[in-house]
Amino acid sequence: MRVLISAVGDTDPFRNFHDGSLIHIARKYRPEKVILIFSEHTAKKQGNIEKALFSIAPNYEPELIIHDPIISDNEVHIFDVMFQRFSDILQEYYTKEDEFILNLSSATPQIKSALFVINRLNGINVKAVQVSSPEHASNENIGHDNDENIDELIEVNKDNKVNFIDRTIEDNAEKFSQALLKKTARDFIEKFDYKAALDILDQLSDFPNLKSVREEIRDVVNCLSKQDVPKGLRHKKLKEEEQKILSAYLTIELQRERGNVSESFIRIKNLTEFILEDYIEKRYPGLIDEYCEDIQKYYLSLFDYSKLLKATKEFKLKRTIAPIIDMNSSRNKVAHSLSPLDSDAVKQLGIAMKTLKTLVREQYHFSQSDFNFYHDLNKILLTKLN
């Protein structure tokens, strides 16, 4: 069965010697059932709507269902309320066995907008239809025929003929769907969730800049998964080792931005140990090897590096890394157990991140522009996705 669901608006049933949207859709598709949704304001039209529908053709007598309750005039101009109300109405009447048609052109702008969005977001199979004005332009200044005699309006209706001009437009949601996907991708980029953004972008139809955006994000995603250096960082005038250090630090920043606190804890200690090893090796060649032989260890912990800094009287650097050492017990708790993080541990992470940034900046003299790499990348990507 073909079923039309329609609100009733001021242009229904007729306006300016032509069908209103409701009657015109019924004329085109001839639904066997018409579900009518009235407001307090339009409820007085019920008799005229019924007469107009039955006038479409001599043998056309659709089943009419008047939805109850009538919508309050106080609510018809509130989008959120109309969105929920019409979502519920559609779910109430929808069946997979029937073919449903949704009128997108009757009633208040808020109701039409709500139906427009519902059509694109509900995920159920309905045919949504808009109706253009007979002039194919705004009918804002054209009066309503609400007070005219319905029988006379039917008689003079220019659409009331077999070869009427079809003004229906079936609403294909593809364009909106693409816009919604693009917005979702932008939201993921702003949250630094590049993998999720790429998954969305791979679903988009081609448009200018899409290919380059995909390539840039795919490079970042691949590098993050392999702990490699993104192409944008490789193009900076930095030594290979500096590129790796900066990339590792920025990866930790990304994890924190995305709320992955546990991963940030684990990575901070590893990067700090790498930086301290590099620092000591450059200034005190052979010291680490001697220390490892003495204690018979092949892997030095953060505590070991702290002892070496004390032995070499690198007290300033030892003080600099103190917050990271304090954080280490919380880090171990996360890494080696299922214990949740408490608020103090999260606070420690913020302090440790500032410490790590200071350490990285002082040891490798990176500029603020270097630290802004992903923020700047996001600006470029978002501009291309406008």
Swiss-Prot record:
Q: Report the family membership.
A: Belongs to the CRISPR-associated Csm6 family.
E.C. numbers: 3.1.-.-
The entry's function note states:
CRISPR (clustered regularly interspaced short palindromic repeat) is an adaptive immune system that provides protection against mobile genetic elements (viruses, transposable elements and conjugative plasmids). CRISPR clusters contain spacers, sequences complementary to antecedent mobile elements, and target invading nucleic acids. CRISPR clusters are transcribed and processed into CRISPR RNA (crRNA). The type III-A Csm complex binds crRNA and acts as a crRNA-guided RNase, DNase and cyclic oligoadenylate synthase; binding of target RNA cognate to the crRNA is required for all activities. Csm functions as a non-specific ssDNase. Base-pairing between crRNA and target RNA to form a ternary Csm complex activates a ssDNase activity; target RNA cleavage suppresses the ssDNase, a temporal control that prevents uncontrolled DNA degradation. Viral RNA transcripts probably tether the Csm complex to the viral genome, recruiting Cas10 ssDNA activity which is able to degrade DNA in the transcription bubble, spatially controlling the DNase activity.
UniProt lists the gene as csm6'
Q: Where is this region: CARF domain?
A: 1-146
**Pfam families given in the database record:** Cas_Csm6_CARF, Cas_Csm6_HEPN
Protein keywords? Antiviral defense, Endonuclease, Hydrolase, Nuclease, Nucleotide-binding, RNA-binding
Domain-level remarks: The N-terminal CRISPR-associated Rossman fold (CARF) probably binds the cA6 effector. ssRNase activity resides in the C-terminal HEPN domain.
The record, for InterPro entries, names:
CRISPR-assoc_prot_Csm6 (IPR013489), Csm6_CARF (IPR053955), Csm6_HEPN (IPR053941)
User: Which example biological process does GO assign this protein?
Assistant: defense response to virus
Q: Which GO terms describe its molecular function?
A: endonuclease activity; nucleotide binding; RNA binding
Q: How does it assemble?
A: Homodimer. The composite ssRNase active site is formed at the dimer interface.
Q: What else is known?
A: Encoded in a type III-A CRISPR locus.
Region of interest (HEPN domain), ranges = 147-386
Q: What is this protein called?
A: CRISPR system endoribonuclease Csm6'
Q: Report the activity regulation comment.
A: Non-specific ssRNase activity is stimulated about 1000-fold by cyclic oligoadenylate (cOA), a second messenger produced by Cas10 of the ternary Csm effector complex in the presence of a cognate target RNA.
